[in-house]
């Protein structure tokens, strides 16, 4: 049997529709237009693509979108001054600095400087700590999207064996916290883990977030398991053709074993942007002292 495909296109469109409805409510009932500021330093072509799609989707959801572009050789102080300006701007409810930053810039200092109330990436240590403590927090978009996708297959993740492969601050660690909030039993694997294939075969839920193309093989998957592929690995096309996007999972093999699986492209990546809109609405509500929205 081949796996059910968890379709990021459909699910992210549903999330965006809910965000748009919430934005309409905020405008009519409270006169608030949620605003997202995206800061892009340098001109990495992949980042350009993401930033463009963020801008488009923010506007389509009825929110205000502010783009700030700085040259790759911008001094750290100038970037910090922009963050301070955005922190103080009442029209801005969410601030995202596209990562990674060009060499020579200190991204930790930048992330630290973002007002935690506007940190829609959920990377500020205040938000990471609040999430780990079970307090209200803005949570990183990719883990949030990954959980939403898993929950389209399993209404409850309670008691399930979840394996998170990867321990980054952006994905692995916050994903672990969100899974614990869902009452899953969580194992974290990383580059030093012994016998990853055997560990993987015990997992009902596999989240692959390592950044290595097609590392997770089909025979690592427990039959019927749900596989969420967080990897986006850009690989040059054959014979000078277009670049290909590959996930961290060997999709063709894994889909013959898994019960449900996300594709790349068309999976978690689309959810990341949709969840950024969710976080911007959540931030706007919290900043204005309104209850947590239904998105
Ligand atoms: N501060 C920060 N926050 C981020 O959330 C962040 C970041 N920096 N830097 C880069 C990564 C990457 N990322 C993606 C967003 C959308 C897709 C996406 O839409 N992917 C589509 C198509 C992608 C394509 O065709 O190139 C898909 O998977 O189907 C992927 C990846 C957000 N990131």
Curated annotation (Swiss-Prot):
GO biological process: L-histidine biosynthetic process; methionine biosynthetic process; purine nucleotide biosynthetic process; tetrahydrofolate interconversion
Superkingdom: Bacteria
Cellular component per GO, a single term: cytosol
Record text on subunit structure and interactions: Homodimer.
PROSITE patterns on file: THF_DHG_CYH_1
Pfam families, A to Z: THF_DHG_CYH (PF00763), THF_DHG_CYH_C (PF02882)
InterPro entries: Aminoacid_DH-like_N_sf, NAD(P)-bd_dom_sf, THF_DH/CycHdrlase, THF_DH/CycHdrlase_cat_dom, THF_DH/CycHdrlase_CS, THF_DH/CycHdrlase_NAD-bd_dom
Pathway annotation from the record: One-carbon metabolism; tetrahydrofolate interconversion
Binding sites annotated in the UniProt record for NADP(+): 166-168, 191, 232
Role summary: Catalyzes the oxidation of 5,10-methylenetetrahydrofolate to 5,10-methenyltetrahydrofolate and then the hydrolysis of 5,10-methenyltetrahydrofolate to 10-formyltetrahydrofolate.
Protein name according to UniProt: Bifunctional protein FolD
Keyword check for Amino-acid biosynthesis: yes
Catalytic activity: (6R)-5,10-methylene-5,6,7,8-tetrahydrofolate + NADP(+) = (6R)-5,10-methenyltetrahydrofolate + NADPH; (6R)-5,10-methenyltetrahydrofolate + H2O = (6R)-10-formyltetrahydrofolate + H(+)
Family statement drawn from the similarity comment of this UniProt entry: Belongs to the tetrahydrofolate dehydrogenase/cyclohydrolase family.
EC number: 1.5.1.5, 3.5.4.9
Keywords assigned by UniProt, alphabetized: Amino-acid biosynthesis, Histidine biosynthesis, Hydrolase, Methionine biosynthesis, Multifunctional enzyme, NADP, One-carbon metabolism, Oxidoreductase, Purine biosynthesis
GO MF annotation: an example: methylenetetrahydrofolate dehydrogenase (NADP+) activity
């Amino acid at each position: 049997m081949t796996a059910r495909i968890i379709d990021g296109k459909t699910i992210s469109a549903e999330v965006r529709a809910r965000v748009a409805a919430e934005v309409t409510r905020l405008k009519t009932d409270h006169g608030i237009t949620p605003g997202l500021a995206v800061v892009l330093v340098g001109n990495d072509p992949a980042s350009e693509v993401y930033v463009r799609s963020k801008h488009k989707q923010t506007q389509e959801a009825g929110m205000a979108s502010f783009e700030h572009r700085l040259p790759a050789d911008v001094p750290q102080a100038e970037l910090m001054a922009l963050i301070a300006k955005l922190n103080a701007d009442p029209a801005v409810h969410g601030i995202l600095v596209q990562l990674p930053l060009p060499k020579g810039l200190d991204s930790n200092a930048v992330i630290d400087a973002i007002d935690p109330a506007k940190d829609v990436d959920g990377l500020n240590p205040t938000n990471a700590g609040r999430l780990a403590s079970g307090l209200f927090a803005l949570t990183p978009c990719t883990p949030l999207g990954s959980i939403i996708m898993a929950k389209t297959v399993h209404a409850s993740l309670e008691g399930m064996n979840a394996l998170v492969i990867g321990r980054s601050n952006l994905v692995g660690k916050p994903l672990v916290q969100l899974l614990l909030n869902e009452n899953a039993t969580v194992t974290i694997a990383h580059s030093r883990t012994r016998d990853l294939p055997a560990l993987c075969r015990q997992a009902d839920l596999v989240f692959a977030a390592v950044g290595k193309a097609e590392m997770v093989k089909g025979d690592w998957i427990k039959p019927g398991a749900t596989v969420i592929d967080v990897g986006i690995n850009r690989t040059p096309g054959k014979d000078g053709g277009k670049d290909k996007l590959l996930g961290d999972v060997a999709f063709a093999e894994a889909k013959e074993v898994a019960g449900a699986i996300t594709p790349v492209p068309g999976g978690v990546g689309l959810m990341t942007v949709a969840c950024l809109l969710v976080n911007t609405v959540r931030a706007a509500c919290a900043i204005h002292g309104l209850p947590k929205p239904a998105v």
